[in-house]
Design a protein with these regions (language model features):
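Charge-rich alpha-helical segments
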Residues: 1-96
Length: 96
């Protein structure tokens, strides 16, 4: 699926596109709450840097994430950028 010039299947293959095509979603699973919280901390710091914030929830070792650009009412490059960063943070945390 091409969105805002990005091939989502190639760039962020682990993310699911919503039925209306306006958001992407993924649930990250970690070994325990500590890892999930570390992941969320890394993501929160990065989100502040780029001024783009996820909709998310945490339940023990799982973090469910939904990304969209509310001001545009659609997916944008910022969502893809944050999704890629979140994938990298998840790998980083899971390797510890």
């Amino acid at each position: 699926m091409i969105v805002d010039g990005f091939d989502l299947d190639k760039e962020i293959p682990l993310w699911a596109l919503s039925s209306k095509g306006k958001s992407i979603m993924q649930t990250f699973t970690f070994a325990d709450f500590k890892q999930a919280f570390e992941f969320m901390t890394l993501c929160a710091q990065y989100a502040e840097q780029i001024d783009h914030h996820p909709d998310w929830s945490n339940s023990w070792n799982k973090v469910a994430v939904k990304l969209t650009t509310h001001s545009a009412g659609a997916l944008t490059a910022l969502d893809v950028q944050l999704a890629k960063a979140m994938d990298a943070f998840a790998s980083q945390v899971n390797q510890r």
